[in-house]
Design a protein with these regions (language model features):
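Small-residue (G/A/S/T)-rich helix-start motifs and N-terminal tracts that mark the onset
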Residues: 1-89, 97, 184, 195-349, ...
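Internal gly/pro-rich beta-alpha loop/helix module
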Residues: 126-127, 132-223
Length: 510
């Protein structure tokens, strides 16, 4: 199961900002860009040595840019300690950047050789270092590099990517063409969005970070993107006052569960309870009342009528609508009534499909689309959504207001004017029915506990993914059910509790 270390930063920089900031930082600290390249190469070399101490023949793939310059430094350091190194370099009519040219010269002066990229690879190669393409890539790699990438991916040796796996777009996490499937990735100066969302989860392997000694400069900079992970839950979820009562923790109304979908509304209701909601009322089809009360007697379950809905809206602190709502007249009428609710609300599932038909803008609303729902909301294809998840989350906010949670690997949370978070928890076990219903209940509960809509969305996504990570660490990802999260969710939303049986290898709160 992929899990990023807690030591990596929680600030994330746009790729263009890093490239500009690198020069500013070097000037501010009296460093040259070549000195930063030497530090990057040293950091990458140390990751290679630490992760693969027995590797004795390294194949270093160097591109024709500063990422390739890092590769020359890695190769020279490896050769200096007696490791056999075969270095393949991409040819180009353009001159190398100054820093990369210096690194290349140092490699040659150390007795290194440079081979054409089309040579037959030695059979003894047991580690591949990817320094082909860096963070400036904005399109699919050209054919000659794609062939190298495919060759590396088909080779049995592990791959360490320098700064970013070649072919992965640093800004978006998209892969428009061939991409290195790295086992380890060492990135420098600051995290890039593309390392945390989209296809990054498939290709980065274990992520490492090195600031290259720029910490003092970085500390004085502001960034608009944040990485959110389980160790931050204690920031949002404080211990409760001993004298608090159920009314203090939110009255949540959940609306949905049309014919045949009682399970969706039941999962949302229980998730809200497990995430700490004081009182949860479910409005649903009359046929669902007995099964829901039998399954979870702590829920208050009523038939959805215009009268019960009107009374419940007056009672509620928060409304969650959508799980199992359907798109027939029953669900449409309920949604029309809820539209003008003035307190926090969350729309999911069929509420989003109906919203796509009749769009409106509400600043007190959290929407939680998966990529298919987001595509309908924005009138585009799923491929367009996945090609730039951060931008699409921001577009959702611009069009619909409030907070947008674009679900998927590396869930993105966006709010006006420029709040942007990437959720760095979760796993492939969550690709199963009902997970979105559970998330809706969790976020709804946190809204009821007086978190701001943006904080509730971020904390809810983290608690959701962290609960699944505990399960994955114990049992694996295959066969995980949405209701399995209830066994770990209570522990996760009480981060102040020390559980001696808690598996610290999981990606959950300490």
């Amino acid at each position: 199961m992929k899990k990023n270390p807690v030591s990596i930063p929680h600030t994330v920089w746009h790729a263009d900002d890093i490239r500009r900031g690198e020069r500013e930082a070097a000037d501010a600290l009296g460093l040259t860009l070549y000195e930063l390249m030497l530090r990057a190469g040293e950091a990458a070399f140390q990751v290679c040595r630490s992760a693969y101490p027995d590797a004795r023949h390294w194949l270093v793939l160097c591109g024709h840019g500063n990422n390739g310059g890092d590769g020359y430094v890695v190769a020279r350091l490896a050769k200096a300690v007696g490791i056999e190194v075969t270095l393949l370099a991409q040819e180009s009519d353009k001159p190398l950047p100054e820093e990369a040219a210096l690194a290349r010269e140092a490699w040659l002066n150390a007795g290194g050789e440079i081979h054409a990229s089309n040579i037959v690879w030695p059979e003894s190669v047991d580690l591949i270092v990817d320094a082909l393409l860096g963070t400036g890539l904005q399109q699919a790699p050209r054919e000659s590099i794609s062939q190298l990438i495919d060759h590396a991916n088909s080779h049995p040796a592990p791959i360490v990517a320098v700064d970013i796996p070649s072919g992965l777009l640093a800004e978006t996490g998209a892969t428009p063409g061939a991409v290195i499937n790295a086992d380890q990735t060492i990135t420098f100066i600051a995290l890039k969005p593309g390392l945390l969302t989209g296809k990054a989860w498939d290709v980065t392997g274990q992520l490492h970070f090195d600031s290259l000694g720029l910490d003092s400069w970085l500390a004085g900079q502001e960034t608009k993107i944040q990485r959110f992970s389980a160790e931050q839950l204690s920031h949002w979820l404080k211990p409760r006052r001993p004298t608090s009562h159920k009314g203090d923790h939110g009255r949540v109304v959940i609306i949905g569960g049309d014919h045949g979908t009682a399970g969706a509304i039941r999962m949302t209701g229980e998730a809200a309870l497990r995430a700490g909601a004081g009182l949860v009322r479910v409005l649903t089809r009359s046929e669902n009342i007995a099964p829901l009360l039998t399954a979870r007697p702590e829920l208050m379950v009523h038939e959805l009528t215009m009268d019960s809905l009107t009374e419940s809206l007056g009672w509620a602190d928060v409304v969650v609508i959508g799980p199992g709502l359907g798109q027939q007249e029953w669900g449409k009428k309920a949604l029309q009534k809820v539209e003008n609710f003035r307190k926090p609300m969350l729309w999911d599932a069929d509420a989003l499909n109906l919203l796509a038909i009749n769009p409106d803008k509400r600043h007190n609303r959290v929407i939680t689309p998966h990529p298919g729902e987001a595509a309908r909301l924005l009138g585009c294809s799923v491929a367009e959504i996945e090609s730039d998840r951060l931008h699409c989350a921001q577009r959702l906010v611009q069009r619909y207001g409030g907070v947008a949670v674009l679900k998927g690997a590396g869930t993105v949370v966006a709010a006006h004017p420029d709040a942007l978070g990437i959720i760095d928890v979760g796993n492939a076990g969550m690709a199963s029915g009902g997970m979105g219903d559970v998330l809706s209940g969790i976020i709804g509960a946190l809204l009821g506990q007086k978190l701001s809509p943006y904080d509730a969305a971020c904390a809810g996504c983290v608690a959701h993914g962290a609960s699944a990570d505990v399960l994955a660490a114990r049992f694996g990802t295959r066969g995980m059910l949405a209701t399995d999260l209830f066994s770990t969710l209570q522990r996760i939303v009480n981060p102040e509790v020390t559980d001696k049986n808690h598996d610290e290898s999981s990606n959950s709160a300490p």
